[in-house]
Amino acid sequence: MKPEFLESAEFYNRRYHNFSSSVIVPMALLLVFLLGFATVAEKEMSLSTRATVEPSRILANIQSTSNNRILVNHLEENKLVKKGDLLVQYQEGAEGVQAESYASQLDMLKDQKKQLEYLQKSLQEGENHFPEEDKFGYQATFRDYISQAGSLRASTSQQNETIASQNAAASQTQAEIGNLISQTEAKIRDYQTAKSAIETGTSLAGQNLAYSLYQSYKSQGEENPQTKVQAVAQVEAQISQLESSLATYRVQYAGSGTQQAYASGLSSQLESLKSQHLAKVGQELSLLAQKILEAESGKKVQGNLLDKGKITASEDGVLHLNPETSDSSMVAEGTLLAQLYPSLEREGKAKLTAYLSSKDVARIKVGDSVRYTTTHDAGNQLFLDSTITSIDATATKTEKGNFFKIEAETNLTSEQAEKLRYGVEGRLQMITGKKSYLRYYLDQFLNKE
């Protein structure tokens, strides 16, 4: 090799194969890469809590139907039952007496309904349709209605008679005053005619009311001006007096002719009375119909208990027992024995239920994604993906604090439904958002949520 090449190679090695080029530069490049990755890449933020598998709906509440001792009990947790399967059989007791009581009550209610329908028809047609006196007092109610209607008619008739009498008296008074007005007007005309005769010197008919005054004037000398003035003044005084009386008569005439209107609301009052009674009857019929349905239902239930003395499954499903009564041989009537859940295989969905503290619940909302993982069998875990469907508005108080109930409904495959059981516990992971790795580690360092 030529010596100049050796010198060049040595120079290259010294310049580029040093500590800076071998360590610092690669580390700097790595740091830049990691910083860029931490800035761009995102990490899912999540919460985790325990959750249980619950039914999406409850098919039926199985309640004790007797206070008697349980002889046969086929209730088992998570047991798959078919419609009609025997669940509980009781020792026969007082069901027979109760069945008779329901039957007697039902007969009485039906008779009461029949009598009430008689009352309804009687009210509608205004005639008594009761074949005989009833023990519920409905016929007496109809008689009371007839009496009230009669009182209304009598009151209205009496009122109209009084009004007619008053109107007749008013008409008669007005007619009499009208006659006085006519007579007074005739007198005024006579005196006005007499005045004109005195003033003009013409003759006056003898039948004129002022003829005597006219004659007196004529006898005193009609040529005397003073006599003429006195005669005219006397006539005018009579006219003024008559006009004053006429004005009074006219005022009396105007006030005396008022006619009162006859009472015309009888039909509406009678219709209102009938409507009130019919409305009350309608309400009682509705109430009786409800009572009859209840009595028929009770009679049917007691009859079934009397005949069979057992509880059977109302439909296909899975049993969930009430832990408070699962080991009891005597359970009070009406107490919950178990609940019937839909089969997971047939329903194809389930509900995941969990509880979160008030601190964590603020970080989630309806629609957030969740993942459920079973924990009872580490070698055969199930993973279910869903979204939050509901969050309780109020917290549930416990010894450990206040917790909010959250639910997430999830669909199941046939394989998942076969392996899953109601009540199975697992971990529920809720994705609350995303952060870059840089922001995540900064928040961790600064102890931020």
Curated annotation (Swiss-Prot):
Assigned keywords, A-Z: Cell membrane, Competence, Membrane, Transmembrane, Transmembrane helix, Transport
Q: How does it sit in the bilayer?
A: Single-pass membrane protein
TM spans (from-to): 21-41
Cytoplasmic domain ranges by topology: 1-20
Keyword Transmembrane present in the record's keywords: the answer is: yes
Q: Does the keyword Transmembrane helix apply?
A: yes
The protein's location, in the record's own words, is: Cell membrane
Matching InterPro entries: MesE/LcnD, MFP
Mind telling me which GO cellular component terms the entry cites? plasma membrane
Q: Which Gene3D superfamilies match?
A: 2.40.30.170
Q: Its GO biological process terms? A: establishment of competence for transformation
Stretches of the chain found on the membrane's Extracellular side:
42-449
Q: What does this protein do?
A: Required for induction of competence.
- Family, as annotated: Belongs to the membrane fusion protein (MFP) (TC 8.A.1) family.
Q: Which PANTHER family match?
A: MEMBRANE FUSION SUBUNIT OF EMRAB-TOLC MULTIDRUG EFFLUX PUMP, TRANSPORT PROTEIN COMB
Q: What is this protein called?
A: Transport protein ComB
